[in-house]
Amino acid sequence: MPITRTLPQPIGRFAPSPTGELHLGSLTTALASFCHIKSIDGKWLLRIEDTDTERCDRQFTEQILIDLEALGLNWDDDVIFQSERIDIYNDYISSVLRPLTYSCQCSRKRLERYWTQQEQQTALTDANISTDLSVSVNNDKRVDSHLLPNRQRYPRFCIKANLSPTQNKLRIQLPDYCIGFNDGIQGIQWDNPQQTLGDMVARRQDGMINYILAASLDDGLQQVTHIMRGLDILPMTTAQISIMQAARLPTISHWYHLPLICNPDGQKLSKQNLAQPIDTRHPSKLLAYALKLLGQLPVDHDTPERMLNQAISQWDNAPLQGRQSLNMATIVGEK
């Protein structure tokens, strides 16, 4: 008899941070990830990334859940709250990730002073070289950006200091080589996590866990296979891959980074830019608008559930491929 192999069910997720209500940018991410994973008969998980207790608010969490339900974006399984999983993250930090971590007492002020000195030295050296070669230097004496020190790379002052892990921040060493992956929307990607993020802070002195570390562990523990999220998170991806590998967790098999939603002025919609919260009083109209913004075929104006079923049946990533942004001006007046 032929041997049949059962492939694991695809699992996607939406993981908002409750530092504000959902806006059109976060809605399109939720909608795209929901329709895509459901179109391949997968599960859609909801995880609230609320490790930042200073900025996250329970009332925003509650509103996010209300808005998703009003739009028919119903999640599978129980909602995961990262604020309730701190012990899990610390267990990984103190066990399988321990060889990669070290305590650090460097303040931002100290590092800022160090980088400023390095940049001044680089500018002086560059000017001297230019003079020696009889090359004219611009009056403003600006230095090519590729010659400046990389401020993302922590200079590892504390890597051998053997400081207390409970009284200082904790850094994790990221690999200094290129990691590649195929992005289903943006194409083949290569990045060096050490060059991009350096030895990132995994846990602050007050115990707060870095969201990249928490997301990496949770994605592995939840056995997520497909991640569809905003393009602004793309630079974090190789760090996440390396952390999951170091933690001996299954890595993500399918990545998709969506183009960013921009207002008519070309500015990315975000909480920092005071993007307006979505209004779910007319959920069907809002879904139709978001689907059109995502380049999907029109759906019949109906209940959210029926509209989503139609959107799922005809979901297509092709209109999004290679796109860096989607501007609301293209369909302004139809919201």
Swiss-Prot record:
Alphabetically ordered keywords of this record: Aminoacyl-tRNA synthetase, ATP-binding, Ligase, Metal-binding, Nucleotide-binding, Zinc
GO terms under cellular component: cytosol
Endpoints of the signal sequence: none
Cofactor: Zn(2+)
Binding site for L-glutamate: R13, F14, A15, P16, S17, E49, Y211, R229
Motif extent ('HIGH' region): 16-26
Cofactor note: Binds 1 zinc ion per subunit.
Entry's EC annotation: 6.1.1.-
Motif ('KMSKS' region): 268-272
One Pfam family in the UniProt entry: tRNA-synt_1c
Superkingdom, taxonomy of origin: Bacteria
Binding site for ATP: K271
An example Gene Ontology molecular-function term: glutamate-tRNA ligase activity
Residues the record lists as binding Zn(2+): C104, C106, Y154, C158
InterPro entries: Glu/Gln-tRNA-synth (IPR000924), Glu/Gln-tRNA-synth_Ib_cat-dom (IPR020058), GluQ/Sye (IPR049940), Rossmann-like_a/b/a_fold (IPR014729)
GO biological process entries: glutamyl-tRNA aminoacylation
Function: Catalyzes the tRNA-independent activation of glutamate in presence of ATP and the subsequent transfer of glutamate onto a tRNA(Asp). Glutamate is transferred on the 2-amino-5-(4,5-dihydroxy-2-cyclopenten-1-yl) moiety of the queuosine in the wobble position of the QUC anticodon.
Family named by the database record: Belongs to the class-I aminoacyl-tRNA synthetase family. GluQ subfamily.
Protein name listed in UniProt: Glutamyl-Q tRNA(Asp) synthetase
Species of the source: Psychrobacter arcticus (strain DSM 17307 / VKM B-2377 / 273-4)
Taxonomic lineage: Bacteria, Pseudomonadati, Pseudomonadota, Gammaproteobacteria, Moraxellales
Gene: gluQ
